[in-house]
Amino acid sequence: MSIKSDKWIRRMAEQNGMIEPFEPGQVREAAGHKIISYGTSSYGYDIRCAPEFKVFTNIHSTVVDPKNFDEKSFVDMHGDYCIIPPNSFALARTVEYFRIPRNVLTICLGKSTYARCGIIVNVTPFEPEWEGYVTLEFSNTTPLPAKIYAGEGCAQVLFFESDEVCETSYKDRGGKYQGQRGVTLPKT
C-alpha cells in the first residue's frame, strides 16, 4: 500500500470524477484576502467546509446516544462561518463530493491551522467504493468560542492505493453512509 501523489490525485479527479468540484492547485487567497488553503497538495487533497452546520447544544438536555440520536441536540446554521461554543462541537460537510476507487482507502487529518487554535477536525477513513459528501466534526477544545470558516480548507485527505483489490467494498456491504448528501447524523 502506497501513498498517492498530486499527479495521481489530479488524474483520478479529472478522468474518473474522484473529487468534485476539484481544485488542481493550492488556493491560498480569495477576493484579495488570505484564507485557509484548499486543493491539491504534494501527497493529499485539502478539503473545504460547506456553509451548512449543525452546532451541538444542551438546550433540550437530551442524552447523547449514538444508537438513538436525538436531532434536537443540534441547532442548524448556514453562513460563511460558524461559531462553536466553548468545549462543544459542530458538524459540517465538505464542498467536495468523493468517489473512492475499489483499491483505495483514505485517511483524513485536520489542518494544523485549526489544531493550533484548539479546534480539532475529525473524519473517519473513506473506505473503498464509498461515495458522498464527507461529514466533518469540529471539536472546540478551548474554554472560548471558536470560529470555523465555510469555503476554506479544514482537513487533508491522504490516498492509499492497495497492491490488491479488496474482496468486499463499502458499497458491496451496503454501508449506511453511502451516497450521503448533507450533514449526516449517526445511524445504526
UniProtKB/Swiss-Prot annotation:
Give GO BP annotations, semicolon-separated. dUMP biosynthetic process; dUTP biosynthetic process; nucleobase-containing small molecule interconversion
Q: What is its EC number?
A: 3.5.4.13
Which key words are in the record? Hydrolase, Nucleotide metabolism, Nucleotide-binding
> Which Pfam families does the entry link to?
DCD
**Which pathway is this protein engaged in?**
Pyrimidine metabolism; dUMP biosynthesis; dUMP from dCTP (dUTP route): step 1/2
Which residues does the Swiss-Prot or TrEMBL record annotate as the active site?
A: E137 (proton donor/acceptor)
Protein family membership: Belongs to the dCTP deaminase family.
Quote the function comment for this protein.
Catalyzes the deamination of dCTP to dUTP.
Record PANTHER family: DCTP DEAMINASE
The record's HAMAP family line, in alphabetical order, gives: dCTP_deaminase (MF_00146)
Mind telling me what this protein is named? Answer: dCTP deaminase
Organism the protein comes from: Variovorax paradoxus (strain S110)
Record gene name: dcd
